[in-house]
Amino acid sequence: MDKIKVGDKVRIIGKSRVHHCLAVPSTAEVVDTDFTCVKVFGYGYDGIMYDQWVSFVDVKPIRKAVVL
């Protein structure tokens, strides 16, 4: 699996390990990382932007298309 880095766009796919109020599914941007979690900035169910720590297992990288 590719390493998720700061600045990457990710899809929020679950809430298994870290409590967060982000909408699922939704997209968010990674603003910080540590060994088990990523801090993402994205929209919650109420339409307000939140920054939350989310477990790596709860996010899926959104890969950019490669232009040949």
Label each region the model flagged.
Residues 3, 9-68:
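Basic/aromatic-rich interaction segments and small domains that mediate binding to polyanionic partners
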